[in-house]
């Protein structure tokens, strides 16, 4: 699975954000409201399990981590959905005014600008804190996808208000919090 690629679990489709590593083991991070749904994740609908949930945090946060159990060593890249990929070499927190791209399995790659950070978002299941808000278009199924700027990982896609005109917004969980929570790092 590449960053931004589709993942399936518990009858739902989400997206992976970034492939990460710890002690030689490979994982991907995604949205916590996705990993809350299922322990087992596949790369195709009804397909064989490629990874198993090792942690999930939602609400308050919106991140989770899945360990690859299929023996694969996936590239630490994000799918640009045009036949090419973006290498990810570091992670950082988004800043207001920053140009950002989102890769997810529904709306593919969309672009926008970071409009706010440290935002509290009230979902039906409870609030999540310290989120980033961007103008990138997104939709259901993009959840867990990658928010990035060049080779820098910025966020895990959490939710959106859709793609309507200039009012579109995509909310992300800052990825640095997930990386530190699980002791994992992005890799080339």
Curated annotation (Swiss-Prot):
Task: For this entry, list what GO says about its biological process.
Answer: proteolysis
Source organism's superkingdom? Bacteria
Q: Does the keyword Transport apply?
A: no
Upper classification of the source organism reads: Bacteria, Bacillati, Actinomycetota, Actinomycetes, Kitasatosporales
Molecular function per GO? serine-type endopeptidase activity
Q: Where is the active site?
A: 33, 62, 143
Q: Which family does it belong to?
A: Belongs to the peptidase S1 family.
UniProt EC number: 3.4.21.82
Protein name as annotated: Glutamyl endopeptidase 2
What organism is this sequence from? Streptomyces griseus
In terms of InterPro entries, this protein maps to: Pept_S1A_streptogrisin (IPR001316), Peptidase_S1_PA (IPR009003), Peptidase_S1_PA_chymotrypsin (IPR043504), Trypsin_dom (IPR001254), TRYPSIN_HIS (IPR018114), TRYPSIN_SER (IPR033116)
Q: List the disulfide bonds.
A: 14-34, 137-163
Q: Which UniProt keywords apply?
A: Disulfide bond, Hydrolase, Protease, Serine protease
């Amino acid at each position: 699975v590449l960053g931004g690629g589709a993942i399936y679990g518990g009858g739902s489709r989400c997206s992976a954000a970034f492939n990460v590593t710890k002690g030689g083991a490979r994982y991907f991070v995604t949205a916590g409201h996705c990993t809350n749904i299922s322990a087992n994740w596949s790369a195709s609908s009804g397909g064989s399990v490629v990874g198993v949930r090792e942690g999930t945090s939602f609400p308050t946060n919106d991140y989770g981590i899945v360990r690859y159990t299929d023996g694969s060593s996936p590239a630490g890249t994000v799918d640009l959905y045009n036949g090419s990929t973006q290498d990810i070499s570091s992670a950082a927190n988004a800043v207001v005014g920053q140009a950002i791209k989102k890769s997810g399995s529904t709306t593919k790659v969309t672009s926008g600008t970071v409009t706010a950070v440290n935002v509290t978002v009230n979902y039906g299941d409870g609030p999540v804190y310290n989120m980033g808000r961007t103008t990138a278009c997104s939709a259901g199924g993009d959840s867990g996808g990658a928010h990035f700027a060049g080779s820098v990982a910025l966020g895990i896609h959490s939710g959106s208000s859709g793609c309507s005109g200039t009012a579109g917004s995509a909310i992300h969980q800052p990825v640095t919090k997930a990386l530190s929570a699980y002791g994992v790092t992005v890799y080339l």
